[in-house]
Amino acid sequence: LPVLYLVDCSGLFLPEQSTTFRGHRGAGHIFKMNSLLSDEGVPQIAGVFGDCIAGGGYMPIISDKVYMTEQAYMVIAGAALIKGAKSQKMPSHGIGGPDVHVGISGCADFRVPDDTHCIAAMRREMASLPSSAVPYYRYGLDAAPPRFSPSELAGIVPADHRVAYEAREVIARLVDDSLFWEVLPEIGKEVITGVARISGLYV
């Protein structure tokens, strides 16, 4: 079964974690379980809804898909700690908001406007997953021809390799039903990354 995390954690006073977490391992047990689930191939989907400071930021980063609201931020050291240590005033969102983690670091995959949209996006993510890992690559849809004819590729890709062209137009003529789910479009814009199907198989 997939695991969903709804994350909104402002951290805690470390000497008191023995009274906050069960067992003698503290928060480390949570991160260990994150790693073990990942090793077993269990999908982990995280929604970041607010402040995620220190340990609160580890869990989303370990997850397979991470959604951040515009109000959320993930940091190891918050603005107050930076101000105390380096006498620098920096806004928390400037350190670890969606502009940083979706647009630069890649620690989050998608940004959404608010909590309602975040939960809806996580529901859609869940709905796209199969009931078990075995049928994953053929789950849900049969093979389908592209909506745009592959014969049009000759008019899209120029003979001169120095001439730029729109790669998404090429993808639309190769994948099933011309459906392509682009991932991390704000990072490394010279490369297009995403998920689609070819002959019914996820690629």
Region annotations inferred by a language model:
Residues 2, 21-25, 67-68, 157-166:
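Short low-complexity stretches enriched in small and charged residues
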Residues 19-20, 82-83, 125-126, 145-153, ...:
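Short amphipathic alpha-helical patches
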Residues 1-15, 196-203:
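A structural preference for short, pocket-lining loop segments at secondary-structure junctions
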Residues 16, 40, 70, 125, ...:
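Glutamate identity and glutamate-enriched acidic tracts
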Residues 2, 31-34, 42-43, 189-194, ...:
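Short glycine-rich loop/turn motifs
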Residues 7-134:
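Conserved catalytic cores of soluble enzyme domains
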Residues 110-171:
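Terminal amphipathic helices with adjacent charged low-complexity linkers/tails
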Residues 162-203:
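Non-catalytic terminal/interface segments that mediate subunit docking, oligomerization
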